[in-house]
Amino acid sequence: MPENKKMNGLKYFYTRLGKPAQHIMTSPIPTAIVGAYMDTKNSAKRIEGFIRRNHIDLTDYIESKYRCFNDFFTRQVKPGARPIDPAPDVLISPCDGHLSAYKISGDSEFAIKDSYYTVDDLVGGDAIADEYMNGTCLVLRLAVDNYHRYCYIDDGFKSRNYHIKGRYHSVQPIVVHRHPVFKQNTREYCLLQTKNFGTVTQIEVGACMVGKIKNHNEAGVIHRGREKGMFLFGGSTIVLLFKQGVLDIPEELFEATLKGEEATIKYGAAICKKA
C-alpha cells in the first residue's frame, strides 16, 4: 500500500467517525492473532514482498533461511555491523531508530505535540516522578526497516521487568503527536542502575501489530552494548528517562524535536556525552 494511503488511514482512525474501528484495531486481540500467524511457517511467504515494499537493505544482516516471518523480523546483523562507541562517558543508542528529545518539567511533565505526559503515566502510576523532575526524556522510534533488537546503554544492574497491559496504537508521528500513545499502549519497563548515568528508566512500548516485547533477562548485572531484547513484528519505541544534570545534550536536538524533526541513529552509536 502506498505510504500516503497508509497515513490517510491512520488519520481516519483518529477522527470521530473512525473511533469504533480504532477501538477494535488497537485492542490486544488483532495483535495477538497477527503475532501468532507471524510465528507460523506459512508466514515466511510474506518476507519477500515485505522487503520490496519497505525498501529494506539486507547488506548488514546475516544471510539465513527464515522459518517464519518473525525469524526474519528479528534477524541478526553481521559481526561489526553495529559497533558500540568505545568511550565510556558517551551515551549510546540502545537501538536503530528515529530520536527525539524532551525536557521534563519541574512537575515531572513533558509534551509530545498535543499529548501531555507525566513520568508516572509512562510507568503505570508508580511513584517515581520526583526522581526525574527537570530531567530528560529520549524517545527512539523504530520503523519496520530498522534492526529490531536493542541493547543496554551502560554497565550496571537492572531491576526486574514490569509489564503494563494496554492497547496497541500505532507509534507513527501522525498518531503520537495527537494521541497519548505512550501511556495507553502495552509496555514493559525496568530501572537501570548504571555506572555513568545514574538511575535510568527504560520503557519498551508495544505498537499496532507488534506481537511481543521480548526482554531476555530479569534482575541482574548488565553490560554496555549487550543485547537486552527484541520487538517481534511491527515497529515500536524505546523511551529513556534520565535525572536532572546527567546528560550533556546539545540544545539543537531539543529544538529539532520541537519542530517535529527526528534524528536517525544506529544501535550502539553516540547520542551525547554525560554532563
Where are these regions (language model features)?
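Contiguous, well-folded functional domains in the mature portion of proteins
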Residues: 1-275
